[in-house]
């Protein structure tokens, strides 16, 4: 896919946070690849952390392992803040609701204050700005699953549906 890393382009303003699921789970890898293709189609200047990205620690915290969570959070915050000091990372985009919640709401306690955007919101913005447009109609019905961390914890319900409504032919 030829995706640059922040190490290659440290002043890049949009970081695509891949997350654990998209790194290891075959179905989630498809989401990550599709997201990269969409970001490129919209001419978004973005990068990933690559091997510098660690788990956000969300699952460790939910399992009660605060030590592991803090270790991972401190490590990630050091990396992210380092790139911010070089003029990069104004926005973090992620498809993972758990990563979204952790980066946006829990890393502040470790000195990490970021503008984090769920990929549905980011894609909707690209659609509305005319930077992305569906190339063909897609016939069929679609159901969107509201994950706990996206919906109930972060009140993101409409943007995924609005983005889907912009695709001709979907019900």
Q: Where do the language-model regions lie?
A:
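Iron-sulfur cluster-binding electron-transfer modules in prokaryotic oxidoreductases
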Residues: 1-171
């Amino acid at each position: 896919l030829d995706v640059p890393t922040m190490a290659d382009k440290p002043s890049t303003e949009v970081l695509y946070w891949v997350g654990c699921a998209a790194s290891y789970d075959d179905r989630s890898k498809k989401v990550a690849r599709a997201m990269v293709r969409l970001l490129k189609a919209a001419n978004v200047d973005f990068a990933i952390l690559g091997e510098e990205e660690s788990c956000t620690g969300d699952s460790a915290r939910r399992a009660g392992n605060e030590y592991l969570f803090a270790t991972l959070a401190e490590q990630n915050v050091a990396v992210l803040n380092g790139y911010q000091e070089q003029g990069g990372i104004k926005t973090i985009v992620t498809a993972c609701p758990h990563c979204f919640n952790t980066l946006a709401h829990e890393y502040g306690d470790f000195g990490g204050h970021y503008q984090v955007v769920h990929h549905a919101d980011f894609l909707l913005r690209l659609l509305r700005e005319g930077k992305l447009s569906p190339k063909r109609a897609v016939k069929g019905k679609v159901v969107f699953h509201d994950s706990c961390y996206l919906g109930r914890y972060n009140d993101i319900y409409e943007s995924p549906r609005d983005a889907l409504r912009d695709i001709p032919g979907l019900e």
